[in-house]
Amino acid sequence: TIFQVDLTYKNISDFAKQNGRLVPISPQNAQWNVIKDYNDEHKDQPIELTSAESFQVSDAYAWVLENRYDAYFDIKLSFEKAVTDKDGAYHQYADKLTWFPYKGIPTYPLLHRDSKNEEFSKEYTKAIKELKEDGTLEKLSKKYFGEDVFSYVDK
C-alpha cells in the first residue's frame, strides 16, 4: 500500500531505488522473508527492513497517510477489504492510497501425519497437479480474484 502522491513507485524495484521507507514488519511474518529474499537478490539496492513486534493494521495505513512511511506491505485481499471496498474501514482514503503486486507467498495445507492421511496427501497432491496442468486453477483464480494469482508465486 502506498500513498497516491508517491506514484513514482510502479513496482518494488522503484521503491528500493528511491529508498522508500517501509512500515516495520514482524520477523515471524512471511512478508519479512519476501523482503529479505528481495534484498538478498538485490544487494546493490536493498529495502531497509525494520522489525516490529506488533501493531494494528490501522496504524500502518495511518502512518502511510501521514508520510511517516512510504509503503505498507499489504496483502491484496486485505487492501481491497479495508480500502477499495465501499464498506472498508479506510475507504474514505481510497483516492489517496494504492497498491501494486510484487510476489505471491506460497501456502501449503498442513495434514496430521498418520496412515489415513498419507493416502489423502498423495491424492491431494495428484489432484492439485492435475488442476494446475489442465488450467483449472488459473480459471478459478481469474474467476474469484480477477487475475491469475499463481503467476506471482516463484516456480
Segments (PLM) and residue ranges:
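Hydrophobic residues within well-ordered alpha-helices
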Residues: 15, 61-65, 109, 124
